[in-house]
Design a protein with these regions (language model features):
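Extended charged/polar low-complexity repeat regions
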Residues: 106-109
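Detector for Asparagine
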Residues: 3, 8, 65-68, 86, ...
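Amphipathic protein-protein interaction modules
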Residues: 47-104
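Short acidic DE-rich linear segments
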Residues: 111-117
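Negatively charged, low-complexity tracts enriched in Asp/Glu with abundant Ser/Thr
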Residues: 2-58
């Protein structure tokens, strides 16, 4: 399967965008923000997602600096923690297996990007 996401690079950082990923529902910029703000280089995120996919745990709740991810076997919902103060940032829903692929791609790119700085 060809990946439909893209990386946008700046001098000191990069982001992952999902404009062409039809399987991501809702505000796709929420997924972008979650990766950039909360996942960053934390490979443990993959372990939490794997545990849910493999049914080691029924679901998981990942609370970060600005986002909450509700990981379930089929779908994961990501919400901005301050939705009440900034209602323009809406939640998004991602198939959990796809989220695993996205997080892995993000972490690999993150490592390569900052290793080359």
């Amino acid at each position: 399967m060809e990946n439909k996401w893209k990386f946008n690079f700046r001098d000191d950082y990069f982001v992952m965008v999902f404009d062409e990923v039809k399987e991501v529902y809702g505000d796709k910029s929420t997924l972008t923000g979650w990766l950039f703000t909360d996942v960053r280089d934390f490979r443990g995120t993959l372990g939490y997602i794997d545990d849910v996919i493999s049914e080691k745990t029924k679901e998981d709740f990942l609370s970060g600096n600005a986002y909450n991810a509700y990981v379930k076997k089929d779908f994961t919902e990501i919400h901005f923690q301050f939705e009440d103060e900034n209602p323009s940032i809406k939640p998004c829903t991602v198939p959990t297996k796809l989220l695993h692929e996205i997080v892995k791609a993000w972490l690999d790119e993150y490592e390569e990007f900052y290793d080359n700085k």
